[in-house]
């Protein structure tokens, strides 16, 4: 079984082959997702909400992400493993270097950071020192209080152009992947077509190169607010592994996300 790398995902993009990603936080679920063929696993700071019960992701620490990264690493053989850098863990390039090193040593293949132009120097410096970076634009949950809540981003022409420009700049700075969250589908299409690197969408339509969801949403075990862009695959299959396979199959076929999971 060949390991998934950033080069694998780039090849998938070039071939027009859609790929899947899920969040994971422990060895057991990660192992199940990995063995069923999920290409990318993210130890997300979403754990602050789905595991710890917080209202947002801000309380999560680098040490907590590192702990769960070690857990996930022990459970997988194939998938590319990305670790989120938590709120204020990369406020400066120097701080980012220290915390990203901890996550890479915990077993991550790549780290993910949220933000646009202000991050360019950090992305370049991490990349130059052997730490691959996944960027994240659109609805960036660590900025939820700046946005005034979990809201769709890039609906007006000015902000859409800003997000597109930031995507291009992050690629030029060295980012190897890009996540776009809760943006209109036409904007996600424009970004995906403009970039050479693979683009992963969540609430961004079906045109992106890959899709990512939070595992708790896929399995229908999230409490409280359920995002419009999510889908409960366990409800339609009744078994965890079957739910994961259904997710993979629908992404590959381009039937997920459908219009009901997409913003205009």
Curated annotation (Swiss-Prot):
Family statement: Belongs to the PanB family.
GO cellular component: cytoplasm
Functional description taken from the UniProt entry: Catalyzes the reversible reaction in which hydroxymethyl group from 5,10-methylenetetrahydrofolate is transferred onto alpha-ketoisovalerate to form ketopantoate.
Pathway: Cofactor biosynthesis; (R)-pantothenate biosynthesis; (R)-pantoate from 3-methyl-2-oxobutanoate: step 1/2
KW Amino-acid biosynthesis (keyword) present: no
GO biological process: pantothenate biosynthetic process
Keywords: Cytoplasm, Magnesium, Metal-binding, Pantothenate biosynthesis, Transferase
Residues holding 3-methyl-2-oxobutanoate: 45-46, 84, 112
Enzyme class, UniProt record, top EC level: transferase
Tree of life domain: Bacteria
Catalytic activity: 3-methyl-2-oxobutanoate + (6R)-5,10-methylene-5,6,7,8-tetrahydrofolate + H2O = 2-dehydropantoate + (6S)-5,6,7,8-tetrahydrofolate
Subunit structure: Homodecamer; pentamer of dimers.
The protein's name: 3-methyl-2-oxobutanoate hydroxymethyltransferase
Bilayer-crossing regions: none
Subcellular location: Cytoplasm
Lineage summary: Bacteria, Pseudomonadati, Pseudomonadota, Gammaproteobacteria, Alteromonadales
EC code: 2.1.2.11
Record note on cofactor: Binds 1 Mg(2+) ion per subunit.
């Amino acid at each position: 079984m060949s390991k998934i790398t950033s080069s694998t995902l780039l090849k998938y993009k070039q071939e027009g082959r859609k790929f899947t990603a899920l969040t994971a936080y422990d060895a057991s679920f990660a192992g199940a997702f990995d063995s069923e063929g999920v290409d990318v696993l993210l130890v997300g700071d979403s754990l602050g909400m789905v595991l710890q019960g917080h209202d947002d992701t801000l309380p999560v620490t680098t040490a907590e992400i590192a702990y769960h990264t070690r857990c996930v690493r022990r459970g997988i053989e194939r998938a590319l493993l990305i670790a989120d850098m938590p709120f204020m863990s990369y406020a400066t390039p120097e701080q980012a270097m220290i915390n990203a090193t901890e996550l890479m040593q915990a077993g991550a293949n790549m780290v993910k950071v949220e933000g646009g132009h202000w991050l360019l120097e950090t992305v370049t410096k991490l990349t130059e020192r052997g730490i691959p970076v996944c960027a994240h634009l659109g609805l960036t949950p660590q900025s939820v209080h700046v946005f005034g809540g979990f809201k769709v981003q890039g609906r007006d022409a000015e902000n859409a152009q800003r997000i597109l420009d930031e995507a291009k700049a992050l690629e030029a700075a060295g980012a190897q992947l890009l996540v776009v969250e809760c943006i209109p589908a036409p904007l996600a299409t424009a970004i995906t077509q403009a970039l050479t690197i693979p683009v992963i969408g969540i609430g961004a339509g079906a045109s992106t190169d890959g899709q990512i969801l939070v595992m708790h949403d896929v399995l229908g075990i999230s409490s409280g607010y359920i995002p419009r862009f999510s889908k409960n695959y366990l409800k339609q299959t009744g078994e965890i592994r079957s739910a994961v396979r259904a997710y993979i199959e629908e992404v590959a076929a381009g039937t997920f996300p459908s219009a009901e999971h997409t913003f205009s």
